[in-house]
């Protein structure tokens, strides 16, 4: 069974305080998903979901996302074994973003680079230019081995 979502109410108070989950997908049919570790709160990734991905996530308890670059649905961790079990989903005040608190199986890594989080670099300024510096270079798995042939 695939869940369907009602259109968001016109009444702002109903949208912000009513009991119905009525996600506000953007013009491309997507909603932003912020993903953190349910255990320690670390920010793991930011992704997008279409209605099908959100529905599958709610129905199965496993995180599904929509890849804009590949133009397809994907179950997070299906290739790597690092499945995300959803412990809680929250939505923001105007229901145009969701927050998933997850437990990560396998190597406890979320990023395709093998790192725990996709946010492994800091941004700063050096010599008048914006630069990035790697602050977490620990890889929980070797992407070349995990994704060979993909």
From Swiss-Prot:
Enzymatic class: hydrolase
SUPFAM superfamilies linked: HisI-like
Cellular component per GO, a single term: cytoplasm
Subcellular location: Cytoplasm
CC cofactor note: Binds 1 Mg(2+) ion per subunit. Binds 1 zinc ion per subunit.
Top-level division of the source organism's lineage: Bacteria
Pathway: Amino-acid biosynthesis; L-histidine biosynthesis; L-histidine from 5-phospho-alpha-D-ribose 1-diphosphate: step 3/9
Annotated keywords: Amino-acid biosynthesis, Cytoplasm, Histidine biosynthesis, Hydrolase, Magnesium, Metal-binding, Zinc
The reaction(s) this protein catalyses: 1-(5-phospho-beta-D-ribosyl)-5'-AMP + H2O = 1-(5-phospho-beta-D-ribosyl)-5-[(5-phospho-beta-D-ribosylamino)methylideneamino]imidazole-4-carboxamide
Record GO biological process: L-histidine biosynthetic process
Keyword Lipoprotein on entry: no
Protein name (record): Phosphoribosyl-AMP cyclohydrolase
Species of origin: Rhizobium meliloti (strain 1021) (Ensifer meliloti)
């Amino acid at each position: 069974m695939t869940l369907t979502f009602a259109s968001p109410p016109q009444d702002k108070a109903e949208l912000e305080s009513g009991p119905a989950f009525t996600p506000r997908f953007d013009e491309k049919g997507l909603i932003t998903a912020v993903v953190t570790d349910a255990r320690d709160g670390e920010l793991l990734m930011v992704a997008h979901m279409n209605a099908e991905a959100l529905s599958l996530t709610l129905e199965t308890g496993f995180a599904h996302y929509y890849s804009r670059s590949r133009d397809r649905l994907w179950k997070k961790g299906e290739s790597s074994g690092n499945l995300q079990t959803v412990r809680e989903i929250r939505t923001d005040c105007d229901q145009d973003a969701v927050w998933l608190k997850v437990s990560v199986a396998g190597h406890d890594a979320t990023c395709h680079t093998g790192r725990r989080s996709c946010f492994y670099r800091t941004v700063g300024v050096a010599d008048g230019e914006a630069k990035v510096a790697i602050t977490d270079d620990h890889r929980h798995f070797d992407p070349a081995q995990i994704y060979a042939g993909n």
